[in-house]
Amino acid sequence: MPTGPGAEAFRAAIRRGLTIKGIIDPVARANWETGMMVVGDRESDFNNTAVNGEDRNAREGNHSAGTLQFTRTTFEAYHEPGTSADRSDNVAQVCAFVNYAMNHYGVSADGSDLAAKIQQADPTRPAKGY
């Protein structure tokens, strides 16, 4: 499990975001936390100010940003009302990630199939964008 200031700040944000989303079961919380920690590590090394200015999305004016590297359009589409509209806000990214994972990829509310449905969240498989 990753450690360090960025990882610990993101882990705390995951826990706050899961509470906002109403995910209170300890097993479900562990499923989501484990997967999102893998994604945060792979996408940005837990850097909430990371910006990708290099890929196709960036060339099209829709760069990805934040710990989980959401494009502006995806973040806005899956934004959780009541959370910050700033993509550098980790709690807002966590809530948007849960919404995106469940609605776009069909991940169950308990997160038990998160790693199976989003390869980037699976520590046993190679990194792959989502």
Indicate residue ranges for each PLM-predicted region.
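Catalytic cores of secreted/periplasmic lytic hydrolases that degrade extracellular macromolecules
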Residues: A9, A13, G17, I24, ...
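Export/targeting segments at the very N-terminus of extracytoplasmic proteins
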Residues: M1-F46
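Second-shell loop/turn segments in exported
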Residues: M1-G4, G22-P26, G61, E80-S88
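Short, functionally critical alpha-helical segments immediately adjacent to catalytic or ligand/cofactor-binding
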Residues: V27-E54, V94-A101, A115-I118
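A short alpha-helix capping/helix-coil boundary motif
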Residues: I14-R16, T49-N52, E76
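Catalytic and binding regions of secreted/periplasmic enzymes and modules that target cell-wall glycans
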Residues: A65-L68, R72-Y130
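Short amphipathic helix-turn modules centered on a small-residue break
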Residues: T49-E60, G66
